[in-house]
From Swiss-Prot:
Keyword ATP-binding: yes
Record keywords, A-Z: ATP-binding, Hydrolase, Nucleotide-binding
Protein name: Nucleoside-triphosphatase THEP1
Annotated SUPFAM superfamilies: P-loop containing nucleoside triphosphate hydrolases
Catalytic activity: a ribonucleoside 5'-triphosphate + H2O = a ribonucleoside 5'-diphosphate + phosphate + H(+)
Reported function: Has nucleotide phosphatase activity towards ATP, GTP, CTP, TTP and UTP. May hydrolyze nucleoside diphosphates with lower efficiency.
E.C. number: 3.6.1.15
Positions contributing to ATP binding: 9-16, 104-111
Organism (species): Thermococcus kodakarensis (strain ATCC BAA-918 / JCM 12380 / KOD1) (Pyrococcus kodakaraensis (strain KOD1))
Example GO molecular function: ATP binding
InterPro entries from the UniProt entry: AAA+_ATPase, Nuc-triphosphatase_THEP1, P-loop_NTPase
Annotated family: Belongs to the THEP1 NTPase family.
Length: 180
């Protein structure tokens, strides 16, 4: 079975930062990293939404925005509106390309906002059926669904630097084993 690493932890602990650091190191070693990263969008120190970026093309989309701040259609989600069309325009194709083209698939994040898209759910399922290594950030409310499918690494402020080294080591060993 291919390596599956699921990173979880409280908001703001550095899950996306850790995954980006691992992806940069893997890329630096000449491996192809594909998939998607989600980042907060802030204005005046206040979070106003989330942006998704395809790792292979750099294409960006708006995952979610505060209600009343975007012209994009979407599904109400607490104080946000989730833009399902943007998930399906940017994240889903990036994930599917990664299954074919990448050495390591990154999905940040698998969570309730992303799961408003049935196509996103299907794309995650396709990754899990593939033989490609996966590094994914999983929302704490979803982690129990993924726990049986791979390694779960719960980040804290105290362990995040050590976890970076552990996860990078696991990923590199897997990739070197695949390439021989």
């Amino acid at each position: 079975m291919a390596l599956r690493i699921f990173v979880t932890g409280p908001a703001g602990v550095g899950k996306t930062t850790l995954v980006e650091r691992v992806a940069r190191e893997v890329d630096r070693w000449g491996y192809i990293v594909g998939g998607v990263i989600t980042r907060e969008v802030r204005r005046g120190g206040r979070r106003i939404g989330f942006k998704i970026t395809a790792l292979d093309t750099g294409e960006e989309g708006t995952l979610a925005s505060l209600r009343g701040t975007s012209h994009l259609p979407g599904v109400p989600f607490g104080k946000y509106v989730v833009h399902v069309d943007e998930i399906e325009r940017v994240a889903v194709p990036a994930i599917r390309r990664a299954i074919v083209e990448a050495d390591l698939i990154v999905i940040d994040e698998i969570g309730p906002m992303e799961y408003t898209s049935n196509e996103f759910i299907r794309a995650v399922g396709e990754v899990l059926k593939s033989e490609k290594p996966l590094l994914a950030v999983v929302h704490r409310k979803f982690i129990d669904r993924f726990r049986p499918l791979g390694e779960v690494h719960t980040l804290s402020f105290e362990n995040r630097n050590a976890e970076f080294g552990i996860i990078l080591d696991r990923v590199m060993k897997e990739l070197k084993g695949i390439r021989g």
